Structures are given as C-alpha cells and as structure tokens.
Amino acid sequence: TRITGKNQSILTPEQAKALPQMYADAKKPYLPMRTKVIIATPFYELKGFSPYISSMVHVVKLLTQMGVEFEFWELSGDSYVHRARNTICARFLEDPAATDLFFIDSDMQWNPEALVNMIFLPEDVIGGSYPVKNNWASWTSIPEFEQGEDGKNHPRGRILPDGTALLKAYVVAGGFLRIKRIALEKFKEKYPDLWYNEPSADPSNPTRRYHSFFMSQVEDHLLYGEDMWFSKKMREAGLETWIYPNVNMGHYGVKGWTGNYHAFLSGAKDTRDSPEFNTKVH
C-alpha cells in the first residue's frame, strides 16, 4: 500500500493528531492467545539513564495491569553490542514459551502505550525510530519509498485502526526493536551456518551456538552496522521489517535528543514540540 498526502506527508492533519491507543483491555480480539514478552537491555557500562528507568517502570506497571506475561533481562559488561544482542537472542530461543523479544537500549526514553502497541501488532519485526544523537533532524530508521503517480517518492506501509501509520522499513534501529520468535527461527533456517561459539559469553553453557543475527560486516564495499545487517538479512530471509513511527522517543548521551517520527513525517517543523511524554498509567 502506498501512503500519500500533500507535500509528501503520510497522514492528514487529523490523522497526525492521533496518539497511540492505550490498550488496557487484555480481552481485545487482536491479542494473541499466548504471549510472553522478553524485554532485554544490553548494559555496557552497567548503568541506565534516568529517562530509561522511568519509562521502564511505567511499562512494567502497564503490562502487569494488562496481565501480559513478561520478563526483564539485562546483559552487562559486553563492549560489543552486536555480540550482546546475539547472546540475548540465543537465550530467548532456549525458552520455548517466549514469543516476543523487545530490545531497548539503556539510553532510550519512550511512552509505554506505544511499546504495548508494537507488541500486539502482527508484523514479525517492528522498530521505533529515534533521533540520532547530536542531530535531532536525522533519524535512526530508514523507510522504504516508491514513486507515486505524482512523481514524488512516498513511504510504503499501511494505516492502522487508530489512524496512524506503519511503515515498511529498509533499516530498523536496534535500540528499540520488537522481534517475534518466528523471525529468528526463519533467520536460522535461511542461514544455518551463520553461527559462532563463544564460551566466555556464558560459562555455564560453553557449547552454546550463537547465531549472528546482529553483526558489523563489509559487503560490496559498504560497511553495515549491526542493525543494518540485521535488517538486510531479515529481508533476504523473506521477512518484512517495519517502523512504528508514533512513539515519543528520547535518545540520551551528554544530553537528550527527543522527537516523534510520526510528527516528523507528517510535516511538523520541529518534532521536539510533539506532545509531552506520556508516562502516566491509568
């Protein structure tokens, strides 16, 4: 589906004002019969930014209120984020009850209802988009575009029931990324030999095989970062990657960079003026 609008905006002004719906009713018909979510964070420096902690606390409250089964995992001390993600993926696949893996990096901030929306969408791989540090107008995810009859490039995707958009992605960022179990299983089927052994990653299981879902790699004289590699290989395995743009996100370093990708694509002059972070659980 091609999403069109004036001045390459993907939504009407009315749709652009729509915020993610708070899915507080666990009996909604779109909810799967069984869901176990693993929320995982690689901590290199053994610390998380305070906005990350605040957002996570509210997510825990919301998922608990909804009766969604979940666990929080952290992996500390690995200086290679791609290796940390692969270690988490391996452990995730060893839990037969786990259905969804949600990576959230320790320098993120988000509104909790958006995370819940992403969990219960049917697509296999969905990422949020957040501002690049030091440049709020640049974003970490790259949508797919196609040329319309008007000669302009338009993002590809579909309109969700709440009036917001879900965009097909060329690249999804790893710092706020939901992956369904079936996506990792299909990756392993497509690339059965793309694994390594790392005894130091888990001394209690020194023979475990770690698939390279994430890695930095040079191909065709291009350097692929770990999330670019993941996105590329998922598409080559026949899977689609998607962006859920309507998340109020912050990306923190020496200071915070905040924005809403939905507002950015809808033509907002400065997405830092998007609605305040909704961290209140009703």
Q: Predicted regions span which residues?
A:
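N-proximal low-complexity "stem/linker" segments adjacent to membrane-targeting elements
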Residues: 1-79
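C-terminal catalytic/acceptor-binding lobe
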Residues: 2-24, 29-35, 190-282
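Residue-level signal for alpha-helix termini/capping positions
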Residues: 31, 93-94, 119
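Conserved donor sugar-nucleotide recognition element shared by glycan-biosynthetic enzymes
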Residues: 81-85, 227
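Active-site nucleotide-sugar/metal-binding loop of Leloir-type enzymes
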Residues: 86-100
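Conserved catalytic core of nucleotide-sugar-dependent glycosyltransferases
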Residues: 89, 111-215
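Short beta-strand-to-loop acidic/aromatic patch adjacent to the donor-nucleotide binding site
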Residues: 97-109
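Short, Asp-centered acidic motifs that coordinate Mg2+ and/or phosphate
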Residues: 100, 124-125, 241
